[in-house]
């Protein structure tokens, strides 16, 4: 019974997402929820400059380690720290440091060019609770749902640099004892 209810709910939510009824669950750094319109993002002017600076620095050839060091030495809180405290810069910062994974996830996120991407991950079963990443073609991408912070040219340039600098995690050869 619960499985049937879960499937119906999943179908309903996917249908609404495809019809551009976007559900804003996660608030990205640089954006905040609109005070009166449900499920709409507006630019957070307090943080907009930091997001633009991060994309510009990466597009101009600075690496993720350099940018993370810049953000941490200037006492900028990470997205988690900003969400929890509501401030972007803290002189007494003891927690919420930036790291390369957070930065790279931010640089890959299409929300900064005005698109909303949903259905990135799904739960395999309500019993098992394993989460798997959904292929790009099965994700729900709705263009121009909110005002962009970064222009598309800068975003595309950053994506090209990320692809060039990306590491290859595939095995170059099979290990003899693999799978035993």
Task: Indicate residue ranges for each PLM-predicted region.
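Conserved catalytic breakage-reunion loop centered on the nucleophilic residue
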Residues: 1-180
């Amino acid at each position: 019974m619960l499985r049937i209810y879960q499937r119906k709910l999943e179908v309903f939510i996917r249908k609404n997402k495809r019809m551009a009824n976007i559900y804003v669950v996660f608030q990205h750094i640089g954006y905040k929820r609109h005070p009166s319109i449900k499920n709409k993002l507006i630019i957070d002017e307090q943080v907009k400059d930091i997001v633009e600076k991060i994309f510009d620095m990466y597009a101009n050839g600075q690496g993720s380690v350099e940018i993370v060091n810049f953000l941490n030495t200037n006492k900028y809180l990470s997205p988690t720290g900003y969400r929890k405290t509501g401030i972007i810069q803290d002189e007494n910062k003891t927690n919420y440091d930036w790291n390369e994974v957070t930065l790279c996830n931010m640089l890959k996120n299409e929300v900064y060019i005005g698109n909303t991407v949903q259905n990135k991950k799904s739960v395999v079963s309500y019993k098992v609770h394993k989460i798997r990443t959904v292929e790009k073609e099965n994700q729900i991408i709705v263009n121009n749902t909110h005002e962009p912070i970064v222009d598309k040219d800068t975003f595309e340039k950053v994506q090209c640099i990320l692809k060039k600098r990306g590491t290859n995690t595939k095995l170059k050869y099979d290990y003899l004892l693999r799978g035993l």
